[in-house]
Amino acid sequence: MTERLTRTVDISNQRGLHARASAKFVKLAATFDAEVKVTKDGSTVDARSIMGLMMLAAGLGCCIEISAEGPQAAEAIEALTQLVEDRFDEER
C-alpha cells in the first residue's frame, strides 16, 4: 500500500479555478500514474473531473489541498502545485 501525499496551495490567479484552468489541471493530472484528489472546505473531488473541480468554486484567495496516491504521486503533487502557483500560465 502506498502513502497518500498532500500539499496545500493558494489560488492566486484572478479568475480562480474556472473552466480553462480546470481543463489544464485535469489534463496534467491525467498524465500521472496516481489517484489525485482536490479538496476545498471539506469537499473532495477527483482531479480528473473538470465539473468536479469547477463545483469546488475555488476563487482567488481560496486554499485547496491536492492529494495523490500511487507510483507517481510525488511527481503529480509537484507538477500540479507548480501549475497552480504559476497561475495556470494565464497571468504573466
PLM features per residue range, with description:
Residues 12-59:
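Compact, glycine-rich, soluble single-domain proteins
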Residues 9, 38, 66-68:
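Short beta-strand element of the conserved SAM-dependent methyltransferase core
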Residues 1-3, 92:
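SAM-dependent methyltransferases
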Residues 59-92:
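C-terminal structural segments of small proteins and small subunits
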Residues 3-13:
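Short amphipathic
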